[in-house]
Amino acid sequence: MIGKVDMDYASLEEEYMTESEMEDYLDELRHKIPSFIVELLKNNLKNRNLTRNQLNKIVNRVSDLYFGKKPEDKKAAELTNKINDLSHKLDALMKVATVSSATKVSDDIKKEIDNLDELDLAVESPRIESPQTLEPVQKIEEIDEIEISEIDTDDELPIYEEELIPEIELIENPEVDTEVDTINSENYNSDVVINNSAKIGSLPEPTKELDRTTGLENEVKIPMDYVEVKNMESEIAKINENTRLHELPEDTLSTMLIFKWLEFLISRVGTNNLVDVLDYYYTLKWISGKSVNKLLKISKNMKYFHEDMEWKASKSMTPEDHVVSLLYIEKLAGRPISMDELEEMEREITRIKKWANELQTL
């Protein structure tokens, strides 16, 4: 019984449709495709013998051509889905590879640092234990003892007493004065006199140099206020050279852009907090001090009326508002940023946000 029903249904599909059936079938498609396409199909399919399957294929083909659909679109969609899946997998693999490589590099650096510390310890230990440095010291001590024994202390001592005292008075060093006060002229030994005389004999030379330098300082006196002003001017010049916007242009388009920028800033923070925002941009080296002064002069006679009567200005701006200000600054400086660069920047930001979210989920 089921086989008979299938045969009857297949025979109906293979039978040719009459013109009235074709018109009824096409009229039912008016809510799916435009009416002019239905009229074109009626005119082109007159006096043709077509089955229901053939008519369905013709209608589907015409609708696909009209709506811009091609049989290749499905394949392209599948390919794009596969490519997206592969790109996600590659991103995950790259993240794993970067983490593993970073850990390997950190381990290698730690090993190299440990090896360097061991080498430093191995190099320093023989230097401390080397007996060669002690030999010249012993020789010097022996020579000093021989020279001291050969000197007649009775004849030499009064001379050193008379020569020591005036030389010590010339030196303006508190450390030397304290050392000299501790020496008693009556109870000193011959060893002490000889060693101190050798030291003090070389001291008057720097005192003479000090006297010369003090004389030059007395002759040439530069006022400190002048030096500070010069230093301030040089620092301000360096800051202005490194700013993004050194000076505001004066053409008509630039002045219109300046008014728009000030209107944007006042709409965010109001006129009272405008000075703080401009000072913030000055500290970031976005604009120069000259530009800040000119912007404040322009904003003196500006008023902003908000649609909301209960609106209150905030003391700070959002990061998006600062980005808009940076775009205004680059435009006024003659370096406008194209839309392609902005779109690339937005894509990079979205990628970074996705990576951050994926890392948090790991």
UniProtKB/Swiss-Prot annotation:
Protein family: To M.jannaschii FlaD, also to FlaE.
UniProt record, GO biological process: archaeal or bacterial-type flagellum-dependent cell motility
Domain of life: Archaea
GO cellular component terms listed in the entry, alphabetical order: archaeal-type flagellum
Keyword Chloroplast applies: no
Organism: Methanococcus voltae
Subcellular location: Archaeal flagellum
Name assigned to this protein: Putative flagella-related protein D
UniProt keyword terms in alphabetical order: Archaeal flagellum
